[in-house]
A protein has these predicted regions:
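Hydrophobic core register within WD40 beta-propeller blades
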Residues: 51, 128, 195-197, 262-264, ...
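Bacterial Sec-dependent N-terminal signal peptides
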Residues: 1-20
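Beta-rich catalytic cores
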Residues: 45-47, 122-125, 191-193, 258-260, ...
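Beta-rich carbohydrate-recognition and catalytic domains
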Residues: 17-44, 53-121, 130-186, 200-257, ...
C-alpha cells in the first residue's frame, strides 16, 4: 500500500459533480477532522484507515503501511516504514485526541504492531467489528513476490484476529489469530473477504471481492453469519444471486468495479444502505451506490468527490475511500481516503501526502 504497481495506473481527470437528482450535496474538506490525525514526531502518516468504535469515548484506527520519524520543512526526516500501526482516538468534552501505537523488534527497533504468529509475511488490517466485549478484525496476509518496483507483493491469505481486551493499550492486547478458510488464491483468480462489515438485525454481513488476472475491476462479494459469530466459519453463507449458499463457489458478484477497500453501512438520512469506494483503478474519484438491502441491487454510481491531491502532481494518486460511520451523523457522512506518491521518495519529500484525509458530504433528507 505504501507503493503500488504504478505502470498500471489509470488516472481519470474531472471535476466534482453530482447528478441533479442526487441525494448528496457537494463534498467539502473536513479539515477539522484531518488535523486531529496529523503529527510532526513519531507517527507521521499511514494509509488503510479502518476504524472500530469500541465505546462512546473510544475509537480504534487500524492503519496499513506506516511512516515513523519527524516532519520538518514539509519533509519526512529519519523515516522508517512499518507494515501496520494502531491509533486510539479518545473523546472528552467535545474534543478528541489520538495516540499511536506500533511494535518493537527484540533489538528495540520499530516494527508492525500486528505480526503473523509464524513470522512469515505481514498484515494489512481491514474491516473489524465489536462482538460484545471482544474485537474481531480481518487481516490480509501479504508476502513478497516477483514483480515490478512497487508491486513486489501478493496476497497469501486472510486471518481473523480476535482481541479479548481491546480497551487496553494495543501493545498489551491478547490476540488470537485464526486462518479464514473462505479464501481462494490462484494464478487466474482470487477471492478474499474482509473489505467491509455491516450488522443488520440478526446477521453480520461480510463483504469481499473477486479479482481475475489481468482485470482492472474487482467484483463485490458478500457472505453472512449469525450476529457475533464471525469466527464460526462453518456457518457462513454466501450470496448466490438470489439466495444464500454454504458453498463458496456458489457466490455471485453483486456488482463490478469496487476497490479492495470500501465501506457498506446503513444511513438513516437516506433510509438505504450506502456503498462508498474509489472508482476504477486508482481513480481520484470517490463514488457511491445505494440499495434497500445489504446485497443490492445497487443503484448507478454517483460521484461524490474528486480528490484534489491528484492535481498537485502526476506522481500523486488517491485511494482507500470509505465512510467512517462513527464520525458520521444522520444527514452527514464522513469519508476518509489516502493520497500517495508513485515512489517512496515522493512521500518522504512531500509531507502533505500520506495522512488520513477526511471529507464531509451532506445528505438531502429523504421524506
Amino acid at each position: 500500500m505504501a507503493t503500488i504497481c504504478f505502470w498500471m495506473i489509470m488516472m481519470i481527470s474531472g471535476q466534482d459533480g453530482l447528478k441533479t437528482n442526487s441525494p448528496f450535496a457537494r463534498a467539502e474538506p473536513a479539515k477539522d477532522i484531518s488535523d486531529v490525525f496529523k503529527s510532526s514526531k513519531g507517527w507521521i502518516g499511514a494509509d488503510g484507515n479502518y476504524s472500530v468504535k469500541i465505546s462512546d469515548e473510544k475509537t480504534l484506527w487500524f492503519y496499513s503501511d506506516t511512516w515513523l520519524g519527524d516532519v520538518e520543512n514539509n519533509k519526512r526526516k529519519n523515516p522508517v516504514l512499518i507494515n501496520n500501526s494502531v491509533g486510539v482516538q479518545e473523546f472528552k468534552d467535545g474534543q478528541s485526541t489520538v495516540q499511536y501505537h506500533w511494535g518493537k523488534t527484540v533489538e528495540g527497533k520499530p516494527s508492525a504492531l500486528l505480526v503473523p504468529k509464524d513470522g512469515n509475511g505481514w498484515f494489512w488490517p481491514f474491516a473489524g467489528i465489536m462482538q460484545g466485549e471482544k474485537l474481531v478484525l480481518f487481516l490480509f496476509l501479504m508476502e513478497k513476490a516477483d514483480g515490478p518496483s512497487g508491486f513486489a507483493f501478493k496476497n497469501a491469505g486472510v486471518v481473523l484476529a480476535e482481541i479479548d481486551n481491546p480497551n487496553d493499550a494495543p501493545n498489551f492486547w491478547h490476540i488470537k489469530q485464526i486462518k479464514v478458510p473462505h479464501v481462494s488464491i490462484g494464478e487466474q483468480r482470487k477471492v478474499l473477504f474482509g473489505s467491509a462489515i455491516c450488522v443488520v438485525k440478526d446477521f453480520t454481513y461480510i463483504y469481499g471481492y473477486e479479482e481475475n488476472k489481468g482485470g482492472f475491476y474487482k467484483k463485490m462479494l458478500l457472505a453472512r453469519c449469525s450476529k457475533n459469530q464471525v469466527a464460526k466459519f462453518a456457518d457462513w453463507e454466501f450470496y448466490d444471486g438470489s439466495g444464500w449458499s454454504k458453498n463458496l463457489e456458489d457466490a455471485k458478484p453483486l456488482m463490478e468495479g469496487v476497490a479492495s477497500e470500501y465501506s457498506v453501512n446503513y444511513v438513516p438520512g437516506l433510509k438505504k444502505f450506502l456503498l462508498v469506494y474509489h472508482d476504477a483503478f486508482l481513480s481520484p474519484d470517490i463514488v457511491a451506490r445505494t440499495s434497500l438491502n445489504p446485497w443490492g441491487p445497487w443503484s448507478e454510481k454517483i460521484k461524490l468527490h474528486t480528490c484534489e491531491e491528484k492535481r498537485w502532481s502526476n506522481e500523486v494518486f488517491c485511494y482507500s475511500g470509505k465512510v467512517q460511520p462513527w464520525l458520521s451523523k444522520e444527514n452527514e457522512i464522513i469519508i476518509s481516503y489516502a493520497a500517495n506518491a508513485k515512489s517512496l521518495a515522493g512521500v518522504i519529500n512531500d509531507a502533505r501526502l500520506y495522512w488520513p484525509t477526511f471529507i464531509r458530504v451532506k445528505i438531502n433528507p429523504v421524506p
